[in-house]
Curated annotation (Swiss-Prot):
Its EC number is 2.3.1.274. InterPro entries: FA_synthesis, Phospholipid_synth_PlsX-like. This is Phosphate acyltransferase. It is found in: Cytoplasm. The gene is plsX. One of its GO terms (biological process) is fatty acid biosynthetic process. It comes from Shewanella baltica (strain OS155 / ATCC BAA-1091).
């Protein structure tokens, strides 16, 4: 296995080193080929490394900085003034080829702004997109993009998102010709605004993307398609609504299983199965949103992620780096554009 180096914004998120450092140690235990550069306040980081095994410490490097991008920083302000922040330095490690990927649980807007400026977009990509997984009844992940990086998108941008999402699914899940759909207000060809209509026409003119047509909101979790494309306004609302519904269902299930002696007895008997179902509904199980379309790999973790959830984001970054995702997207876009122009 080829050695990989990840850069972690150790100070990002609600919990900082309390979560990021233990998660990094667990990642090193899982992947013997992995090296991790922790960027942040060395004094705070060292607290969580005191009990670490020597063989793990040998694969950790610390780059000290006491500057942090706060959750309240506006993206433009962070880009202009937080030039020595843990987030920016972690991204610069990817830009300078010292790391193959970066993971941060910090300010999403600042992360996207810094990544776009420092890493630049791939040839043929107008805007990067934020993409993550949703659960489905088929037990396989469904990729949804964009999740908020671009509030409004033209048809060409939606087309590019479809290509990037398809390649991501192929790379991470090793799925041949994943099914791609555009999220719309109806499945009929006449439905939707001009941007969605024109994006559909572009996708219908290439055989390299397995475009299946429109999909409505009630089919998002069906598993009938692998990649769902929309603008960032719709995608972000869809994601946050999904997380809210998942929390509601978990709450209602737990409350229902504690009412009455007989129900509590049955709950104990089927506890392992209940736990498995709750795990599948837990948003942390799908933690890690990829900012794709850049010349480097950037993965965004939930700000409130715990150690296990943050480890999931690290694992996603490892997989994307192993598959060389940016190169795959670049090659596929070039091939499709050449095909269309001919």
């Amino acid at each position: 296995m080829t050695n990989l180096t990840l850069a972690l914004d150790a100070m990002g998120g609600d919990h900082g080193p309390h979560v990021t450092v233990p998660a990094a140690l667990r990642a090193l235990q899982l992947h013997s080929f992995l090296k991790i550069i922790l960027v942040g306040d060395k004094t705070e980081i060292d607290v969580y490394l005191r009990q670490a095994e020597a063989n793990l410490l040998s694969r950790i490097e610390i780059i000290h900085t006491d500057e942090v991008v706060s959750m309240s920083d506006r993206p433009v302000h962070a880009l202009r003034t937080r030039k020595n922040s843990s987030m920016r330095l972690a991204i610069e490690l990817v830009r300078d080829d010292r790391a193959q990927a970066c993971v941060s649980a910090g300010n999403t807007g600042a992360l996207m702004a810094m990544a776009k400026v420092l890493l630049k977009t791939l040839p043929g990509v107008d805007r990067p997109a934020l993409v993550s997984c949703l659960p489905a009844v088929t037990q396989k992940p469904v990729y949804l993009l964009d999740l908020g990086a671009n509030i409004s998108c033209d048809s060409e941008t939606l087309f590019q998102f479809a290509v990037m999402g398809s390649v991501l699914c192929e790379a991470v899940d090793k799925k041949s010709r994943p099914k791609v759909a555009l999220l719309n207000v109806g499945i009929e060809e006449i439905k939707g605004n001009d941007q969605v209509q024109q994006a559909a026409q572009l996708l219908q003119h290439t055989d390299q993307i397995n475009y299946t047509g429109f999909i409505e909101g009630d089919e998002i979790y069906s598993g009938n398609v692998d990649v769902i494309v929309c603008d960032g306004f719709v995608g972000n609302i869809t994601l946050k609504t999904s997380e809210g519904i998942a929390k509601l269902l978990v709450h209602q299930l737990k409350r229902g299983l504690t009412q009455g002696l007989f129900v509590r007895f049955l709950a104990k008997l089927i506890a392992p199965r209940i736990q498995a179902v709750l795990s599948q509904m837990n948003p942390d199980h799908y933690n890690g949103a990829s900012l794709i379309g850049l010349r480097g790999i950037v993965v965004k973790s939930h700000g409130n992620a715990d150690e296990t959830a943050y480890l999931q984001a690290i694992s996603l970054a490892v997989t994307e780096a192993q598959r060389r995702l940016p190169e795959m997207i670049k090659d596929r876009l070039e091939s499709i554009l050449l095909d269309i122009n001919n």
